[in-house]
Regions:
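Carbohydrate-recognition beta-sandwich/jelly-roll modules
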Residues: 1-60, 78, 84, 91, ...
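Compositionally biased, intrinsically disordered low-complexity regions enriched in proline and serine
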Residues: 6-9, 70, 116, 134
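Short amphipathic alpha-helical segments, especially helix-boundary/capping motifs
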Residues: 22-27, 62-66, 135-139
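Short, contiguous strand/loop micro-motifs
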Residues: 35, 74-76, 148-149
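Active-site beta-loop-alpha junctions enriched in small/polar residues
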Residues: 38-40, 64-68, 104-108
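Surface-exposed, active-site-proximal loop segments in enzymatic domains
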Residues: 67-82
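Active-site-adjacent "subsite" loops/lids of carbohydrate-active enzymes
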Residues: 83-91, 98-171
């Protein structure tokens, strides 16, 4: 992949710009330390605060398990977020750190409401025999379809989701 994919990336709009000419916030370029939080609980928030106390401001907090559904299920239906999540984000930001929640940008759970409502199968990758590519992870044991990254439907969903996360939950970005 290194021999063909890396050179290919430099021919694409998203890969041919230098870091200096990309629209990357300075805080992200300056980030020295990222921590991963798993959940929205008092215990998790105490651990985040303890880490900030020790290392100081400027930490990036990469948040997982912030949504109401079990992990690796109901993608991309992340809303509503857990009720405490917005307060967690606010606390992190008041301590001069940045919060960036995780979303899965390639899987769509056929059990998600959006899969039926938006005809998720139409945006899913298919094998040569026409069947869907699917994956099951040990975190959930739920079958998910692999979504075509070139699908205009999927672009709309992911862009809308990223906008909603940043605008309604006031995060510093989305991973």
């Amino acid at each position: 992949a290194l021999q063909w994919y890396r050179p290919f990336t430099f021919t694409c709009e998203w890969g041919n710009k230098s870091l200096q000419s990309r629209n990357i916030p300075q805080w992200l370029l300056d980030k020295d330390l990222w921590i991963r939080s798993k959940g929205v609980t008092d215990t998790v928030m105490a651990a985040i605060n303890k880490t900030i106390d020790f290392f100081g401001e400027g930490i990036g907090v990469h948040t997982y398990y912030w949504h109401n559904y079990p992990y690796d299920t109901h993608y991309p239906d992340y809303f509503p977020a857990k009720p405490e999540f917005e307060g967690m984000i606010s606390t992190i930001q008041k301590r001069k750190c940045h919060a960036v929640p995780y979303i899965n940008g390639r899987l769509w759970d056929p059990a998600a409401d959006s899969y039926t409502a938006l005809n998720g199968a139409s945006a899913s990758c298919r094998k040569a025999d026409g069947t869907l590519y699917t994956e099951i992870y040990p975190t959930s044991k739920v079958l998910n379809t692999v979504t075509c990254p070139a699908s205009s439907l999927w672009h709309e969903i992911i862009i809308g989701l990223a906008d909603k996360i940043q605008n309604e939950l006031h995060t510093n970005g989305v991973y």
